[in-house]
Amino acid sequence: MSIAPAVSEWFAGNGRDLPWRRPGFTAWGTLVSEFMLQQTPVVRVVPRLEEWLERWPTPADLAASSPGDAVRAWASLGYPRRALNLHAAAVAITERHGGVVPEDVPSLLALPGIGDYTARAVAVFAYGHRHPVVDVNIRRVIARAVLGPGEPGPAAKRDLADMEAILPEDVTDARRANAAIMELGAVVCTARSPRCDVCPIADQCAWRSAGYPAFEGKRAAVQKKFAGSDRQVRGLILAELRASDIPVTAGEIALVWAIDEQRERALAGLLADGLVVEAAGAYELPG
């Protein structure tokens, strides 16, 4: 028996009210939200998403601004390379697609910075096409409820096939099931504290039926701590540049982090990524 019907019924009464789930939300808004949600919690994304769409309501609006404006507006969302990719995608949409976000997966995949998950998510949630969409939350639900292990392990090619086997044939039902299973993994079947007492498919869950066995497979890679990392140093340098209307000198950048080797490595990485450019011996966001 598929878990989709029960999860979809639960979702109808328990899904969170999020901007990208509301009627009339644009395909561009969906694309922006997916970029932001890639590695940032929902609670931090919602206010920034609303700011972005008010400032840049269409791809053409963002394309007309500089990449530096996009990086500056990205601010504390983290992984600012996404801002450059989103700006590049906006330029491509404007130039290749007349300012309209494409709706088929191959065309979406051809845009800068868009991988398989984002392409499928936009095709499904913005345009209503039938595709399996697999993120970490969906992988966790399938691993536990259908396959039995307590964790999904590293991403694998079989993930899409596992989700495809669950999806209803009806296009509307499939779209709802994608969103519902994703939501279940986000708020109920969580990684550390699953709330099995309120789970709508607890009676169908293979992991629960087996007595919650410990996971013995290969685990997904765990992200290193942020404090003291190169990521933190990169963020501090970018924050310094965002706060300045003029290029920032190497001496000023030296004040943000005391360890010379790590600071220089972080700055070199930002330059290589195109997030920072050199200007007459100083540094600034890309123009």
Across the structure, where does each feature detected by a protein language model lie?
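Generic start-of-chain signal for non-secretory N-termini
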Residues: 1-2
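Catalytic cores of DNA base-excision repair glycosylases
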Residues: 5-6, 10-232, 240-242, 247, ...
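Residues in the recognition helix of alpha-helical DNA-binding motifs
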Residues: 122, 266-269, 284-286
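Core RNA-modification/binding signature centered on pseudouridine synthases
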Residues: 242, 280, 285-287
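Short amphipathic alpha-helical interaction segments
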Residues: 257-272
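A short, conserved structural fragment
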Residues: 271-283
